[in-house]
A protein has these predicted regions:
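Transmembrane beta-barrel wall of Gram-negative outer-membrane proteins
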Residues: 22, 293-402, 638
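Short, acidic, small-residue-rich periplasmic hinge/interaction motif at the N-terminus
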Residues: 40-44, 73-75, 87, 91-143, ...
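Surface-exposed extracellular loop regions of Gram-negative outer-membrane beta-barrel proteins
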Residues: 191, 533, 557-570, 611, ...
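A beta-strand signature from Gram-negative outer-membrane beta-barrel systems
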Residues: 206-252
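Outer-membrane beta-barrel signature, preferentially recognizing the C-terminal barrel domain
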Residues: 418-442, 573-586, 629, 658-715, ...
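Gram-negative outer-membrane beta-barrel transporters
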Residues: 712-714, 732, 736-835
């Protein structure tokens, strides 16, 4: 790791200390004046060649005085020949301006357009010319970044942080401090469903980043966009067919440092039964021990666990460029290990802060197999009519073992100094398979060229989540004189879960262009209809050892030797997670857009009608086993853009948006999780927000930018998950969603990108401030001395919001020698991880810095080698309570002043070395 860092720093320093004895120059676009990257500059007399850097600059060193001919060439520009005179010293910079190739050569023009689709120049142009507030990460930037998934890429954008998964990688996006529930995800502008069994949000770690042309984040909405995005919307623009043959391939391998240090524990996933005995044999079947495979109990160490990444993209246009085809695929197989310490806690008596009751030391071993495939066929019948068919399939398989030792602090056997405690051992083997599929037939038609056009989409999407035979086994144990020993079997659970989400949708947009008072005005009307059908299934079997007194090491040596008895032979399908849900969304909108002088105006109104319902298949006395929510929302919006100068904008926008409840969130039954109980809330309402944005934009050239913006959100009935007490049994608590009055969220965003000759800087900073006031529990003694729980109000930030977020990336590019390097750091400030039932006992996640590195070297022809390293600083995830209880003072790991540690996870570094081919 130190060697990689030294190499990167040496690359940076070499630029600073190099001396120039010859002459320098810049190459610009003749029309826009923007610097051009990657232009070939040939010094004809000496055959020396230079490529322009990140700021369009080039340099020739040790050039003897005299007359020279420069030949300047680029794929998308006309080749230019220019005569220059080189003096002994004090040579003035040579400024060269290139014009684009002749537009009559349609092939080259289309190539240029497609070549630029994933470029930094295109990304900056989209941000500048867009009708709304947005940020873009180009495919070019993604390729040279350390990030392998979209979830990790998106954290580089201002105002965006990520929620990590159990292996330390990013998983969900948090936009502008608004929890993951407040944004939606698009592929090529089409909303996709979520594989989650309860909620709507899409895990972004399922998407390999190499399949993208660019990643767009919309921070304000226009009327032609769906309205359920208070935080914003994420759009993945996938690779499109180029004009000439595209052939890109890469393969890489690497390792996780934690796997090297701790090893990797695996189980036999091949024998897992995809269906529970209830499904396989019918509802009246009594399951026995032989119905449960032993593979999930067969743990073994894996001595060789390398990571592997591979990708392939092939595309071209045919039939005089009328037919375009592209196919792309990506496969990633990663092994990760995590070391975790978790503390269970409880607020007792009148204590202000929680008391730690037990500590669990866990070791995770996780194998992730991520595959993605997409293809697109488009055909242009003529210049006025075009059809395309796009399909994408994403699959993420996660095989995880989790082994834990629980130390009970509340038991009388606990004596820390003597090394005595009551223990419990828990092992869990789990397979999760998530899939997302989308197929979109799209048409573009110019009915009256220049006057009337129509575009439409017919969409089928599906998402699936399967967790078959999730196996947990528990043993009792004891620690005596610091020696830990498993003893007898406590029990086992075998759980099956699955859910499917199928969407059929249609979109249509009709645009009429008219001139009013000499100004061109676009009037657009359109609509959407989506029919969503969701099903969810849950079943759980409880197993008990036949020999309840059997001792580990005497009667059995591993889990496969235990004889089991099934306590509930028919299973437990009567659960709130066994339900059907549906949602029918109908929307229509009217939008206008015009530009008068320097002012561009885009506005209109959208109306969305929602019919969301659920049906519990096995109710257990709930008062509303079947229910629905029907409502209509009117969502106006207005986006203003004023061009202060050619490369400067001031934007202002207003839009109203909503956030619908998740599918399970309105199902009234309870489910029992490992550490808490969870319940739905059929009275949960949608949240409505009014959103304001103001942003100043400066684009001095095609690669540099300065963006300074502020935003304000007023959210009615925001949805927050909190821990609540049962109304009839206050000692029982559960986790549930609720609406909490009115919340306010405002902030500041700054983006800055600057490229010098070979060095570039990308940095952004976001400040976010929100407040929401909710009821919290507090315990007191009344006048009789009896313990009583009262409600008090407390104001806090929104769940998941960090006040401070920042990114800094240092880039190095030497086109002549074929070097690309990037050192990227992302800071996420403290944020609430879990909202507590009790006042002052919310769980917070500590602020953290994640640093990653990537280096690439072109070696010959179309080949390059690259290296990527993640989590260089071994940044942990730390969860804590802002306060301490004196009763926790002598417990292990509780040494921080004014903090109660609840969880601490370490992941260590990951390394990857690969080869890339680009035709």
């Amino acid at each position: 790791m130190k060697t990689l860092l030294k190499t990167f720093l040496c690359l940076l320093l070499s630029t600073a200390i190099a001396k120039a004895d010859g002459f320098k120059g810049h190459v610009y676009d003749q029309k826009t004046g923007e610097p051009l990257i990657g232009v070939t500059v040939l010094l004809e007399q000496t055959k020396a060649v230079a490529l322009t850097g990140l700021d369009g600059s080039f340099e020739f060193k040790k050039t003897t005085p005299g007359q020279y001919t420069l030949v300047i060439s680029h794929l998308t520009y006309k080749t230019l020949t220019q005569q220059i005179t080189v003096l002994e010293k004090d040579n003035a910079p040579v400024n060269i301006y290139l014009s684009e190739r002749n537009s009559k050569n349609l092939s080259e023009v289309v190539v240029a357009a497609n070549t630029k689709a994933s470029s930094e120049k295109t990304a900056r142009k989209l941000e500048q010319k867009s009708a709304q507030v947005m940020n873009v990460v180009s495919g070019q930037a993604i390729e040279v970044s350390p990030d392998l998934t979209v979830a990790n890429v998106i954290q580089r954008i201002s105002g965006v942080s990520v929620e990590r998964s159990s292996n330390g990688d990013g998983q969900y996006a948090i936009l502008r401090g608004m929890d993951k529930r407040y944004n939606y995800t698009l592929i090529n502008g089409v909303k996709i469903p979520s594989p989650d069994n309860k909620y709507r949000y899409v895990p972004l770690d399922i998407f390999p980043s190499e399949l993208l042309d660019r990643l767009e984040v919309y921070k304000s909405l226009t009327p032609n966009m769906e309205g359920d995005a208070i935080g914003g919307a994420v759009n993945m623009v996938m690779k499109d067919a180029p004009n000439k043959l595209l052939l890109n391939a890469n393969v890489a391998t690497g390792y996780s440092q934690m796997v090297l240090d701790k090893g990797f524990t695996a189980f036999d996933a091949g024998g897992i039964n995809s269906k529970s005995p209830y499904e396989a044999h019918g509802k009246n079947y009594d399951a026995g021990p032989k119905d449960f495979a032993t593979g999930t109990l067969n743990y073994h160490n894996k001595n060789f666990a390398p990571n592997m990444v591979a990708g392939l993209s092939v595309g071209q246009r045919f039939l005089n460029d009328k037919l375009g085809i592209i196919l792309a695929g990506s496969f990633q197989n990663n092994y990760r290990s995590t070391t975790s310490t978790f503390y269970n806690s409880s607020v007792v008596e009148t204590d202000k802060y929680a008391v730690i009751t037990s500590m669990v030391n866990r070791q995770y071993s996780e194998q992730q197999q991520r595959s993605g495939f997409h293809g697109k066929v488009d055909y242009a019948f003529n210049e006025n009519n075009k059809l395309s068919l796009y399909s994408v399939y994403m699959n993420l398989q996660n095989l995880q073992t989790r082994e834990g030792i629980n130390t009970n602090f509340s038991n009388a056997d606990y004596n820390g100094p003597a090394g005595n405690a009551q223990l419990s051992y828990e092992s869990r083997s789990r397979k999760i398979n998530q899939q997302i599929y989308n197929s979109t037939l799209h048409g573009d038609h110019k009915i009256i060229p220049g006057k009337l056009k129509l575009d439409w989409s017919a969409v089928f999407s599906s998402a699936r989540n399967e967790v078959p035979d999730n196996t947990t086994i528990k043993l009792n144990g004891i620690r005596k004189n610091f020696e830990e020993t498993p003893t007898t079997v406590s029990g086992s659970n075998r759980r099956w879960e699955r859910n499917t989400d199928n969407d059929i949708a249609g979109y249509a947009n009709l645009t009429y262009t008219a001139k009013i008072a000499g100004t061109k005005v676009d009037f657009t009307a359109g609509g959407l209809y989506r029919d969503k059908q969701r099903s969810s299934f849950f079943n759980n079997y409880v197993l008990k050892a036949v020999n309840t007194y059997g001792m580990y090491g005497v009667d059995f040596n591993d889990y496969t030797e235990i004889e089991w008895d099934v306590q509930n032979p028919k299973g437990a399908v009567a659960n709130a997670l066994t339900y059907d849900a549906s949602e029918k969304t109908t929307a229509g909108y009217g939008m206008f857009k015009f530009k008068a002088a320097e002012l561009e105006v885009t506005g209109g109104v959208r109306v969305e009608h929602t019919n969301q319902g659920y049906h519990m298949l096995f109710p257990r006395g709930e008062s509303r086993p079947v229910g629905s929510q029907i409502y209509t929302d009117v969502l106006p919006s207005l986006n203003l853009k004023y061009e202060v100068a050619e490369h400067q904008n001031i934007r202002g926008s207003y839009f109203r948006s909503l956030n619908r409840p998740g599918f399970f969130e309105i199902v009234p039954g309870p489910i029992v999780q490992e550490e808490y109980q969870e319940r739905g809330n059929p009275d949960l309402k949608r949240a409505i927000a009014d959103n304001l944005d103001l942003r100043y934009e400066l684009f001095p050239n095609h690669s540099d930018q300065l963006l300074v913006g502020v935003f304000y959100k007023r959210i009615q009935d925001p949805i927050e998950n909190t821990i609540k007490a049962d109304a009839t049994r206050p000692q029982d608590v559960y986790y549930s969603a609720g609406n909490f009055g009115t919340a306010r969220n405002y902030g500041l965003e700054i983006d800055y990108i600057k490229f010098f000759s070979k060095i570039g800087i990308k940095t952004n900073y976001t400040y976010t401030n929100s407040s929401i006031t909710t009821d919290k529990s507090s315990r007191i003694r009344d006048e009789k001395g009896d313990l009583r729980t009262i409600l008090v109000t407390q104001t806090r930030p929104l769940y998941g919001q960090s006040a401070h977020i920042g990114n800094l990336s240092l880039l190095y590019k030497d086109s002549n020698k074929g070097w690309d390097a990037q050192l990227a750091a992302a800071y996420t400030g403290p944020r609430i991880n879990t909202v507590s039932q009790f006042v002052d006992n919310d769980l917070w996640q500590k602020g953290f810095v994640q640093m990653d590195l990537s280096i690439e070297k072109r070696i010959r022809n179309h080949f390059s080698i690259y290296a990527k390293a993640g989590n260089l600083l071994n940044t942990p995830t730390e969860i804590f309570i802002k306060g301490t209880n004196s009763k926790n003072a002598d417990l292990p790991g509780q040494g921080e002043a004014n903090e109660t540690l609840i969880r601490k996870d370490y992941y260590k570094q990951t390394y990857l070395l690969g080869v890339r081919y680009k035709l």
